[in-house]
Amino acid sequence: MLGAVGRCCTGALQALRPGVTPLKALNGAPAALFSRRDYVAPAAAAAAASGRIVAVIGAVVDVQFDEDLPPILNALEVAGRDTRLVLEVAQHLGENTVRTIAMDGTEGLVRGQKVLDTGAPIRIPVGPETLGRIMNVIGEPIDERGPITTKQTAPIHAEAPEFTDMSVEQEILVTGIKVVDLLAPYAKGGKIGLFGGAGVGKTVLIMELINNVAKAHGGYSVFAGVGERTREGNDLYHEMIESGVINLKDTTSKVALVYGQMNEPPGARARVALTGLTVAEYFRDQEGQDVLLFIDNIFRFTQAGSEVSALLGRIPSAVGYQPTLATDMGTMQERITTTKKGSITSVQAIYVPADDLTDPAPATTFAHLDATTVLSRAIAELGIYPAVDPLDSTSRIMDPNIVGSEHYDVARGVQKILQDYKSLQDIIAILGMDELSEEDKLTVARARKIQRFLSQPFQVAEVFTGHLGKLVPLKDTIKGFKAILGGEYDALPEQAFYMVGPIEEVVQKAEKLAEEHS
């Protein structure tokens, strides 16, 4: 849409003033408006317009220029500092002053300090050289392994692909996690959201998906750590080195990491998701790859935007969020898509404040997703992990024409029996199991077995649980649940279904339990 507006404006301006070039005419417009993604070789900085700092308000810095006011989204650099401080233009205030967002701490800045316009948005290194490396929001390496020297750089702001470039093929992405593959399967090239409150297992689930999908995938992956714990980022990096996904000795690494963790200023947290996305877009557009993009956590992207929004002087919207919440989210999510050249399959963890899915931040994200995996505190309290809510999680590709009629029928059968059990829980709580009919007793028994069979030991959580991690093929998952629904395992105790892989392990566990009791 913006691209179309930009092109219309350019045409109109040329018609009105033939002597003026489109670039000159749109000089005050956002950089993304008149530039499709351009990949260029890193160039030496040309002579740039300079300004001076006139105000510093937390992460927001006002800069005054005598001439050549930089357009919106341009990157400015503070001169005379040991570490590079990048400011991104957010508003034009009048009187040749721009309001900018700092990408790093503003400690030590003083009024009157010189600032240089780089003449372009924030540009980061892209290409195969980024694999195996960790970079920050402005593309600087933070893994203490020297500079990232790439042949090309790209701006972090760009338009979404045209409708005509998009691909509409639909195929299931098998994760090896029973509850996900059966009830809310993920689409290749789709957008997947993991919703959950604090401490219900979003990051563990995303780590398991990285372990199962990224390793088996064989293509490239990008992980963007947005405002989450530094410890988790560090653990992930070292796990990837140990498992061989990152190879420090040669160039066979399969993953690029982009971090802007909890301790970063809001400017960095609000932009680091775009940096990670830009790295993924290069592999999709230039190398025709099928890329996996993991983002942990999208809520922190919104939260950082909210922190900055108040400092920029915008009037807050519902629940104190920025008034541009839907625009910010849409601008980023529309770029995560599958084109005819390649695909980006994104898995995004989304924190749910106070377990309220109607909060504007998670509610705005729902509209953009192909599959939603909702993690429930009530299920986590039962000790069932992953704590996926089988009745709340949805998928656009849960369609018999895509997944097949057997898969569809088994999934709907599982959901029906769990819903029936949920309806009976009030009666059980008041009157007890003895007051139920024989049919209802059977429903409850099977539902409790299914509930436990939806649990699964994770490879990334082996050290915590003591259970060996399991990866279950889709056909085994369907076979197992179909057999439980059909009553083939009614005789087995429900604890035999807890924390196992395929259905064969249930039988083995039941035999083991019987031996222990005897």
Swiss-Prot record:
Q: Which organism is it from?
A: Cyprinus carpio (Common carp)
The record's section on PANTHER family has: ATP SYNTHASE, ATP SYNTHASE SUBUNIT BETA, MITOCHONDRIAL
One GO CC term on file:
mitochondrial inner membrane
The encoding gene: ATP5F1B
Query: Per UniProt, where does Mg(2+) 1 bind?
Result: T203
User: Where, in this chain's numbering, is ADP bound?
Assistant: G199, V200, G201, K202, T203, V204
Q: How is it placed in the membrane, per its record?
A: Peripheral membrane protein
- What is the name attached to this protein's record? ATP synthase F(1) complex catalytic subunit beta, mitochondrial
SUPFAM superfamilies, per database record:
C-terminal domain of alpha and beta subunits of F1 ATP synthase (SSF47917), N-terminal domain of alpha and beta subunits of F1 ATP synthase (SSF50615), P-loop containing nucleoside triphosphate hydrolases (SSF52540)
